[in-house]
Amino acid sequence: MTTRIDTRFGELKQQGRPALVTFVMAGDPDLDTSLQILKVLPAAGADVIEIGMPFTDPMADGPAIQAAGLRALKAGTTLKKTLGLVRDFRATDNATPLVLMGYYNPIYIYGVDAFLADAKAAGVDGLIIVDLPPEEDEELCLPAMKAGLNFIRLATPTTDEKRLPAVLANTSGFVYYVSITGITGSASADASAVGAAVQRIKRHTNLPVCVGFGIRTPDAAQAIAAQANGAVVGSALIDALKASLNAEGRATKATVGAVADLVASLAAGVRGAKQAAE
């Protein structure tokens, strides 16, 4: 089974360049604007798109992504509507990989089998579920793989040699290396430490390794992407979106462009990493 994620990383490998992976929250600041943002991301330079599933108790997320989730929930975003966004995006883009990222609770409430069937039918390619450890693979990971979805796992600086094989055992698509311990959007990542960590992970897997948490600028994206198969940017995009909203927290004419412009500059940074990596 080859997914859109496998295909995209295969293409990038042939081109000799890392991926820019972008994270946006479904339904932030509202469903219509959210769809417009999703639609402009590929042209702006996003190679893979992670879509956050809003949740009331996002314990691993920093203030920016928590606030984005609250805006989305306030706008009436549900898991069903998030899958609707994916379906609407797929009407005009059948190539860009889409990964749903979030917590297990909303999926559990939706019903695992129903969720996997609906996600696959909508055009979802993979899942990142931050609060399901490998010990609970039967809950969602194994059924997701059976349904033809990639299950992408997080590795961190505290994932030691003993733990790493368990983390990687049923991982597919790519590995998401969290470059700093703590919550999203906090301190910046150290490129040389990231490089050593990526090499350590690659000794255990042939999967691409993408690095996220703490990447906010084109320079940082370039430095990190040079050490890995991709750079993941989330909080910086959410901050750009938030800065474009009006006093009531609603979208303005500048909102979609604010996100697209930042993605374009980050993409230029990541594409510049090809030379840095050689």
From Swiss-Prot:
It catalyses: (1S,2R)-1-C-(indol-3-yl)glycerol 3-phosphate + L-serine = D-glyceraldehyde 3-phosphate + L-tryptophan + H2O. Pathway: Amino-acid biosynthesis; L-tryptophan biosynthesis; L-tryptophan from chorismate: step 5/5. This is Tryptophan synthase alpha chain. Signal peptide: none annotated. Coiled coil: none annotated. Belongs to the TrpA family. One of its GO terms (molecular function) is tryptophan synthase activity. It is an enzyme of class 4 (lyase). It comes from the Bacteria. The alpha subunit is responsible for the aldol cleavage of indoleglycerol phosphate to indole and glyceraldehyde 3-phosphate. Gene3D superfamilies: Aldolase class I. Tetramer of two alpha and two beta chains. InterPro entries: Aldolase_TIM (IPR013785), RibuloseP-bd_barrel (IPR011060), Trp_synthase_alpha_AS (IPR018204), Trp_synthase_suA (IPR002028). Transmembrane segments: none annotated. It comes from Rhodopseudomonas palustris (strain ATCC BAA-98 / CGA009). The keyword Cell inner membrane does not apply. Keywords: Amino-acid biosynthesis, Aromatic amino acid biosynthesis, Lyase, Tryptophan biosynthesis. The active site is at 50 (proton acceptor), 61 (proton acceptor). Its EC number is 4.2.1.20. GO terms for cellular component: cytosol.
